[in-house]
Amino acid sequence: MKTELSEKLFAKAQTLFPGGVNSPVRAFRGVGGTPRFIARGKGSHLFDVDGNDYVDYVLSWGPMIVGHAHPEVMREVQDAMKEGASFGAPSPREITLAELVRERMPWIEKMRFCSSGTEATTAAIRVARGFTSRDDILKFEGCYHGAGDPLLVKAGSGVETLGLPDSPGVPADLAKHTLTLPYNDLAAVERLFAERGGSIACVIIEPVVGNMGVLVPKDGYLQGLLALCRKHGALFIVDEVMTGFRVSSGGACGLFGVRPDLVTFGKVIGGGLPVGAFGGRADVMDRVAPAGPIYQAGTLSGNPMAMAAGHATLRLMTGAAYEKLERLSAKLADGLRERAAAAKVPVQVNRVGSMLTVFFAEQPVFDAASARAASTKRFGAFFHRMLEGGAYLPPSQFEAAFLSTAHSEGDVEQTLHASEAAFAEAAKV
């Protein structure tokens, strides 16, 4: 496999960007080697600058649920661009996308668009604090809610790969208001609320953790968190930046039957362009400026191109589209388990809908501690052999892989064939 041009570009990039990248996980620090520089994407495939062709399971970390350069998405974005990229004023496309979101999730009474998932979660936290007049927030170990200061505490994702449970630059006086507990441990949450429930403004959670690898909520866990929030007057915030419109038409909230006070979105809702959103109960959202005193604003919020891409993408996500995703994702997960067993490599394949992770672990993985027991060395060996076999996986043991509606049976078969040699390589570690 040729990598000469990627290597040259990476050397140049390191003179321009910290670590040579504009987001840490892209640097391949979790697996070693040189990151591939991508020239273009089409459907379920990526093509790097050296001419290598990969079946893509990163999908820009989730947003490309209908694949790369889908003609209908491209057409709607191009139409929007002809009208103007951004106005700094309301536009009809904001209403068009918001109505489609509420059609899929009718319990969202009001929403606000912004420009990233981080912006959405940071704003939701501010709204919860302002609404409740409380300062403390509760999050869970390994759950990543963006790079906002209050949320970079035991945040998983690239922070986990770097071995940094917190980030330098986050003041202790700020971090002290962020309480953390293990994911999937409802009894621990009950004890914390009994001790200091009156100070907790909100509980925020990834309903399906994606940034510690895929972690699946235990039966009744999300419902139990919601009940505790109701009992103690805290708001329940579900971070659907990754799961929203991916694991089902109604997101994880629809899949697991929970109705939070606030929900945050990103990724799929923008169809590959920068976007975020938060919304929920009208009485809470009506406290947001200019309707209320809690300030939130953004120059590019609701920009027409992102609204167009999101609208086109959600429109394409029909019942048949979700059925295809479920069928192919199940085939991939089952096939990976079978091939790992044949190679005598212990793995745990965690999956919810079209997001999954292969953990190189002997025991079930259900929280941050059990995820950390996975072998990153084995994953690294597996990753590089898969890359050579034409499958582009997330370059970290602690990230989710994704499928799109553009993936085919042939893509999955090719990937499973490549995994036979990859598991054999991992078995040597």
UniProtKB/Swiss-Prot annotation:
Catalytic activity: (S)-4-amino-5-oxopentanoate = 5-aminolevulinate
Cysteine disulfide links: none
SUPFAM superfamilies named in the record: PLP-dependent transferases (SSF53383)
Organism: Anaeromyxobacter sp. (strain Fw109-5)
Protein name: Glutamate-1-semialdehyde 2,1-aminomutase
Cofactor(s) demanded: pyridoxal 5'-phosphate
This protein's UniProt keywords: Cytoplasm, Isomerase, Porphyrin biosynthesis, Pyridoxal phosphate
One of the Pfam families matching this protein, by short name: Aminotran_3
Subunit (UniProt): Homodimer.
